Amino acid sequence: MKKMTKKAADRKFKLGMHSYTLHLSGLGESWGFQSEGKTYAFEKVIDLDKFMDLAVEEGLEVLHITLVDLDKDTSPEHLEAVKENAKKHGLDLELNVSFNAPSDPRVNATIEEALEIGHSIGATLVKFSTDVEHPHPISHSCMCPEAMTQMAEIVNNFKKNIPTIEKYGMKIAIENHCDLFSDEVIWIVEQLNHPLIGACCDTINSLVMSEGVKECVDKMAPYCYCVHFCDNRVFADPDGTHSLGCAIGDGDIDVVEIMKILREKAPEELDTIDLEIELPLS
């Protein structure tokens, strides 16, 4: 990458954390616990109040939370209490929802539900995973008819909710959540063509779609309103190919170069970097 401009080099972001980082403690979203039609989750050993305390202790400014962290309690009283507690801690909140999560249905919500919940907790941003299904083989399925049909419906559903998005003034981010190629996220954002609607780039998820990390970040950066900043070790052994979590900077993602790309290319709407670590660590 060419040398950064001084403006880009001096650019600062708030430091946030995705609650999925603590999913083994019951926060965020549990992953892969379906058996005989039942869904299982890690026991919750930390609640949102304690998470806010830890965030302040660690110098975080933003928490990126899910409906699991709200205990699926969306009563006005509870959401107002969450909003006030975040204010008390000096924290901004972002809300993370899915349409049809394959792993943990507790995180699912409609656009309408997510906007109301996000507004009620004072969220600055609502991030959506669209859960678009692609046919196999995945590697050459970008913008395929099966995916485009689903994406067109998603665009129409967001368009119906633009008056509410404008009313509440929250930023909206569409993620490459192991279900969308970067070009597909960009297509959705460009179809919506609204200043409050952008992309969320996860720095690991592109690997699931057989898409290069650098290429994905390069493409998505100009649209990014949200970033899940991850680093994994990627390796092969006799048991197959693996992508395992690690401390940021210890893996195979060049996080320094990615940060340079974001500082140079991302719009002003990207004001926070949300750290996310896969557990258990490699």
Task: List the predicted regions and their residue ranges.
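N-terminal pre-domain/capping segments
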Residues: 1-125, 156, 194
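Conserved beta-strand positions in the central sheet of alpha/beta enzyme cores
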Residues: 64, 94, 127, 228, ...
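A short helix->loop->beta-strand "cap" motif at the edges of active sites that frequently abuts
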Residues: 89-91, 123, 170, 266-273
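Histidine-acidic metal/acid-base catalytic patches
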Residues: 2-59, 182-196, 200, 207-282
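Acidic-and-aromatic substrate-binding clefts and catalytic sites of carbohydrate-active enzymes
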Residues: 65-78, 99-109, 134-136, 176-183, ...
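Alpha-helical scaffolding segments of alpha/beta enzyme cores, especially the outer helices
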Residues: 50-53, 77-84, 88, 109-120, ...
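Short, surface-exposed connector motifs at secondary-structure boundaries
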Residues: 61-64, 163-172, 194-199
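Active-site groove signature of glycoside hydrolases
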Residues: 118-147, 167-182
